[in-house]
Amino acid sequence: MCAEVGPALCRGMERNSLGCCEAPKKLSLSFSIEAILKRPARRSDMDRPEGPGEEGPGEAAASGSGLEKPPKDQPQEGRKSKRRVRTTFTTEQLHELEKIFHFTHYPDVHIRSQLAARINLPEARVQIWFQNQRAKWRKQEKIGNLGAPQQLSEASVALPTNLDVAGPTWTSTALRRLAPPTSCCPSAQDQLASAWFPAWITLLPAHPWETQPVPGLPIHQTCIPVLCILPPPHPKWGSICATST
């Protein structure tokens, strides 16, 4: 049959018949890991040298996000120069400064310059010292003003406890209620008065702390006197009136 058809066509038919029976060959990859590692590394866009006006993709992303990193390589000398140098005053300098502050809290430029030349300090340091001293003075004044009303309030609240020395305190209205009735005769009233109010009765002012005696002048009580009585047994009004009549 191959002679009739031809040798080329016969070989093709045999090849097709063999391909149907055999398993398909595995596709071979055109690259392998070993081949990739052996290849020379090509430069990427990240490693490409940039011109003075060009920005890399990393820098463009950082600038687009708005995040700026602080410079780490800032010299330490610049940091130290920002710190304020504290001035140590001597005793003589403090004495001169406090003397002027006692005279005036707000010295003008001429006084500050003269004082700075006298104590051998720059005028700016003298001005700063006066500012700090004024702040301390205002703070002390505020503390003093806050403490004064508290002391006054405590003194006003504290009242003397030993006011009643001779006995219970009786007001004038209470004494009027204890007075004998007017229907009794005068002699009975005298007896009641002598029996009811003994001779050792004492008069004390209603508020002893309000009256202060002045040396050389008679004492005048400016408030209503209060009778301090040690009450004796109460007499019976009926028996006294009956005996008097």
Swiss-Prot record:
GO terms for biological process: regulation of transcription by RNA polymerase II. GO terms for molecular function: DNA-binding transcription factor activity, RNA polymerase II-specific; RNA polymerase II transcription regulatory region sequence-specific DNA binding; sequence-specific double-stranded DNA binding. Keywords: Activator, DNA-binding, Homeobox, Nucleus, Transcription, Transcription regulation. Residues 42-51, 69-79 have a biased composition (Basic and acidic residues). SMART domains: HOX. Residues 82-141 bind DNA. InterPro entries: HD, Homeobox_CS, Homeodomain-like_sf, Paired_Homeobox_TFs. One of its GO terms (cellular component) is nucleus. The keyword Cell division does not apply. Residues 38-86 are annotated as: Disordered. It holds the Pfam family Homeodomain. It is found in: Nucleus. It comes from the Eukaryota. SUPFAM superfamilies: Homeodomain-like. Coiled coil: none annotated. Transcription factor that regulates gene expression in intestine. May participate in vitamin A metabolism most likely by regulating BCO1 expression in the intestine. PANTHER family: HOMEOBOX PROTEIN ARISTALESS, INTESTINE-SPECIFIC HOMEOBOX. This is Intestine-specific homeobox. The gene is ISX.
